[in-house]
Amino acid sequence: MRTLFGSLFVFAALLLGITSVQAQMTAPPGYYKDQKVVYHNDGGAPDNAAYFRKLLTNIKNHIDAVGKDHVEIRVVDHGDGLIMFQLANNDPDLAHRIDALKAEGVKFLICSNTLRERHIDWHTLYGVKEDDLVPSGVAELARLQQMGYVYIHP
């Protein structure tokens, strides 16, 4: 009986070690080709804050995997997706994540239709500049896909 438990313990330890190595695995150089990607952010109710953190983490992981010089990322924000920039005004962690991704070259694009329909002044959205505004979020998603961007909706 002791031998059985001892063997199971060793097996479990080995399995955990393998899992740990896999979690730290990085792609070899050249594994990923250059990429153009558009992420679709329309919010994640009922817990928008958790959804936004997951979205930004996915984007960061994407950049880390491919390399910032090998990926061009746009994030089209419309509907409840604009809540991310409202929350970031009072959430330093969320603001930092947005800023860090911008520093990596990520461009956040804001839907003017949503601004108009919800009576939101873009000046009140964290880090948004006039150049970030697009006429229509969904039309921008289609335009970017026509330009060869791969669509991702986490």
Model-derived regions: residue spans:
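Positively charged n-region of N-terminal signal peptides that target proteins for export
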Residues: 1-5
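Short, glycine-rich nucleotide/cofactor-binding loops
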Residues: 41-55, 85, 89
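A cross-taxonomic marker for long C-terminal extensions/tails that follow the last structured domain
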Residues: 87-154
